[in-house]
Amino acid sequence: MEDGGSGLRAPRYPAEDTSPTTDRELRGFFCYGLAAEVFAVCAVGSFLPVTLEQLAREQGVLFTDKITPCTAKNATAIANATVNALMSRAEGPDTHQCIVNVFGTELTTASFAMYTFSASVFMQALALVSVSSVADHGTWRKKLLAGFGFTGSVSAMLFLLVVPQIFVVGSLLTVICVVCLGCSFVILNSYLPLLVLNHPVVQSDEDHSIGSSSVPLRPISPGQSNRKPRDTLHQGADKEVNVGSKADSSDLQLSTQISSKGVGIGYMAAVSVQVVCILILYFMNKMGVSSTLPLRTVLFFVGSWWLTFTIPSVMWLRDRPGPPLPTALYEGRAFVRTCMSYTIFAWKSLWKTVKVAVKLRQVLIFLVAWFLLSDAVATISATAILFARTELQMGTVAVAVLSIVATSSGIVGATVWPIISKRFSLRTNHIIVCCLLLLELVPLYGLLGFIPFVQAWGVGGLQKWYEIYPLGIIHGMVMGGLSSYCRSFYGLLIPPGSEAAFYALFAITDKGSSAVGPAIVGKIVDATGQIRPAFGFLAVLIALPIPLIWMVDVEKGQEDAIRMAGLMKTTDDGHEDFDSIEGSSDGHEAEGLMRDHD
């Protein structure tokens, strides 16, 4: 595969790289997933929030008297802290808190970590908007991936220098790390459709299908001719588009295969690194070093991993440039003004992308489902960890083991779901629905704890700590499927040539929903004083996207995406003009994309 094939498809715009996808390029794609997924699982999902809370705790005082340090240094302070803790426990739940002063405002150490991640998600959403559309143009895709990878990994390594006295710096580094992580994943995802489109397997299938069982697209409105095929959208006369089931199946299967393999590699590396991190914590704690130094060392190690594997991924991936940016944006301008122009261009592009997405019925249905689905996944993860730490009284090591169990199951899930799909001839959206139905077992099992005779047993319904581990296996299996199938499924529904912009919309939808579910769960916990009632909300939240995912038709979505790409006229420099959709008679055709297919 290194040498590619002899026949190259025609470029869709000037300077497009239509060279066949090589094994080297695929290794680069997998390598960055290997680098960044480790940080996402080990740092963001495990040790980073604990580190932030512990750094703040060492500078905090008990809420009960606002005098006693949270980390007592001598016997008297330890005795006072113990008495205060016992008294506060007797007064009622959740009154024994550790508070810290942040710029004149008193915050609990736990909420300090929560607010940090909330700010990170908000800043990440802004950054995604500002850079993703730019990644679709010129040679910025690979440059941005490298920039975010190096910046994020170095920021993680700098945690080694953050001592409790400057714990606020840890909050700043967290924001930088999370922003870089999210943006780099969006850019990496934008490579997936291009790798599939230029893969020799897909090109070979298209060559064999020409002149045989090609299925022409029906006109969007009467009197309109069919649009051009996906790989020749802006050249020559209108032609029939080959969207036969065989070609579509080839695209989708290859996309899912690449995505699943990437997720599996990332999860496998995450499990291995997490085991090493636990060993680092164990041995450093045995040495009696500072309580935050082991955690900071772990973050340094994870950041080093991210940096190390980013280097070969940048070397192996091609630029795969998109259409050039409009000349007026950058010629003869200073650096700052150029950056402002790029940012304004990106926000305008997002708004145009949203308007295009609204006109694509299948994309719109999927994004609504994805909003609910991603919110459910994020909320159930946070709720389960909180439930384990509070109501099941599980320690840090036990929770870390739970994380390893779930991640290991994710590896199995990423491998098994494609086998199940092939064995039973299931469509991609059917696999996603199966994953959601399996995930539904988690909150339903938690709700069993409300049934009187189950309570009388003393086991079942998440009354014992060991019951959460089988649920962790289920959660991991589901995540292994959803992580690969959702992004590959979405990639086939978007207009070609706008990959980064639409994957940014995909990520923004994900991040935008992540604050909704946890906030509602927080309100439920505040009102009831328990976490278990939140399982009822989670059961409903998981069920809502199931019918929407079932409704999505990938074949019709591909047809709509190709038509929409054809409606987006190309300027002389290869830049796609979104405004042409509304500024011409083709706007009526775009509206037709929202109609049901007969």
Swiss-Prot record:
Keywords: Amino-acid transport, Autophagy, Glycoprotein, Membrane, Transmembrane, Transmembrane helix, Transport, Vacuole. Pfam families: ATG22 (PF11700). One of its GO terms (biological process) is amino acid transmembrane export from vacuole. The keyword Transport applies. It is a multi-pass membrane protein. Gene3D superfamilies: MFS general substrate transporter like domains (1.20.1250.20). The chain crosses the membrane at residues 28-48, 111-131, 159-179, 182-202, 263-283, 297-317, 363-383, 400-420, 431-451, 465-485, 489-509, 534-554. SUPFAM superfamilies: MFS general substrate transporter. Glycans are attached at N74, N80. Residues 228-237, 585-598 have a biased composition (Basic and acidic residues). Residues 1-20, 209-237, 573-598 are annotated as: Disordered. It is found in: Vacuole membrane. Its main location: membrane. It comes from the Eukaryota. One of its GO terms (cellular component) is vacuolar membrane. The keyword Ribosomal protein does not apply. Vacuolar effluxer which mediate the efflux of amino acids resulting from autophagic degradation. The release of autophagic amino acids allows the maintenance of protein synthesis and viability during nitrogen starvation. Belongs to the ATG22 family. This is Autophagy-related protein 22. It comes from Botryotinia fuckeliana (strain B05.10).
